[in-house]
Amino acid sequence: MITLHSISQTIINYDALNELTDGDEAIQSLIFEGFLKDGQTRMDELELAVAWGDFSQVKLLAHALKGIARTLCAERLTDQCLTLEEAALANDIAKVKEVYAHVSIEYKQVMQLLNHGSED
């Protein structure tokens, strides 16, 4: 049976997050707030860097987003950011654009989950 928890577990690995934070909800809240605050800025900058074909900036921003996604235990977003970083390192604009689209989808899913959770 598919549940909201099982769907959200594929977006953010709550088991890993609880282990990382020893279940401390205050720390988790700080992590969520940090992602909400910094994530959109990184995505806006990343969108411009991809549009301009600025590989060094794409690599740097994908790395930064990967770091905040990893802290949040958003594993699919983390993996997509790593793939984007590698595509930028290879100067492969077609791959960069393709993977950026996946990063954007994963990012939006994380944001929707966090925003929904903050309404509860």
Stretches found by the model and what they are:
Residues 1-120:
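Two-component system phosphorelay core
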